[in-house]
């Protein structure tokens, strides 16, 4: 079974590019990372930074998660991210996404030993 940390990497990490390559980026990535397998995942964020830099956020600014838990952390610096949001015309299995590139602080939930990101909570 895929670990929570491995799932975070599959769903949210794209260190190979510094930003979204094209407006088609989300359509390609959401499919290749298996985020459209049994349904269209409505919203997803990819982070274009090294895994080490994203894992380091777990020792940065402690903030409350959207669900009220206290194991969320906000990055001190902004990071290159791509937001993928399902379009109005999207219909499973032909999931369609709008690609939006941004520089924002990320908020992740961390757990385990080693203490690593397991959930992408928000960007601010």
From Swiss-Prot:
Domain of life, per lineage: Eukaryota
Nucleotide-binding keyword on record: no
Record: active site: 12, 119
E.C. designation(s): 4.6.1.18
UniProt GO cellular component terms: extracellular region
Positions with a binding annotation for substrate: 7, 10, 41-45, 66, 85
Classification via SMART domains: RNAse_Pc (SM00092)
Root EC class: lyase
Tissues where this protein is expressed: Pancreas.
GO terms assigned for molecular function: lyase activity; nucleic acid binding; ribonuclease A activity
List of glycosylated residues: 34
Subunit organization: Monomer. Interacts with and forms tight 1:1 complexes with RNH1. Dimerization of two such complexes may occur. Interaction with RNH1 inhibits this protein.
Function: Endonuclease that catalyzes the cleavage of RNA on the 3' side of pyrimidine nucleotides. Acts on single-stranded and double-stranded RNA.
Membership in a protein family: Belongs to the pancreatic ribonuclease family.
Protein name: Ribonuclease pancreatic
Species name: Eudorcas thomsonii
């Amino acid at each position: 079974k895929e670990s929570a940390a491995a799932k975070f990497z599959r769903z949210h990490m794209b260190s190979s590019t510094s930003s979204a390559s094209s407006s088609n980026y989300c359509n390609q990535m959401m499919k290749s990372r298996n985020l459209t397998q049994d349904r269209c995942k409505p919203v997803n964020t990819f982070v274009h930074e090294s895994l080490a830099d994203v894992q380091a956020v777990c020792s940065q600014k402690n903030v409350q998660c959207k669900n009220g838990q206290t194991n969320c952390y906000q990055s001190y610096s902004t990071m290159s991210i791509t937001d993928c949001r399902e379009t109005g015309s999207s219909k499973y299995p032909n999931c369609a996404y709008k690609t939006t590139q941004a520089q924002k602080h990320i908020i992740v939930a961390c757990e385990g030993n080693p203490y690593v990101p397991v959930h992408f909570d928000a960007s601010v």
